[in-house]
Amino acid sequence: MKNEEYNIKLAAYIEQLQELRKEAVSLATGIIGETLCMDDLFFCASVDRCIRLIDGLIPMLRDRNLTCVGVLLRIQMDNCMRTYAAFIAEDRNAVIRCILDGTPIKSLKDAKGNKMLDGYLKDEVAKIDPIFSKVYNNASGYVHLSEKAFYQTVDSCDNYEIGIQI
């Protein structure tokens, strides 16, 4: 895709991201009331991280830095999964304590008794958004050195030639 085509398509996506950012700011404003409890602190941290990731994503999209876009997308999806974990947890406060204390939630269970491992959380969120698993798996290729790194360096040229771009 040529830069002009890319920029035209990108403008619509950036507009959507900016709308999502506004919604996130509005959510955070609604969370913060006269009193703050642990839930409020957790959800404010989740929303703030979401906003900051959107703010980082937009310039990376404009620069066509797909490696960073993929990594930021994956982090955003992890943020979503951890936030969702608080809603399905057997003990929401335990999830919130783990996240605020910086400890993994993988030993905690959801209301059905399942350990909240990343794979399980991914599958649970995919029940809400059917493409979540596919996007998560593809974005993971940017986090780990994989075929994504190879295909980003290869550029097709004329006469059945390929070029390597770094």
Region spans (language model):
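Charge-enriched, short contiguous segments at helix-coil
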Residues: 142-166
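Residue-identity detector for glutamine
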Residues: 16-18, 76, 152, 165
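Charged, low-complexity surface segments at secondary-structure and domain boundaries
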Residues: 1-4, 117-123, 164-165
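Helix-boundary capping/turn motifs
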Residues: 46-52
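Short non-catalytic regulatory patches outside canonical folded cores
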Residues: 29-41, 55-58, 62-66, 71-137, ...
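N-terminal, Lys/Arg-enriched amphipathic/low-complexity engagement segments
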Residues: 1-46
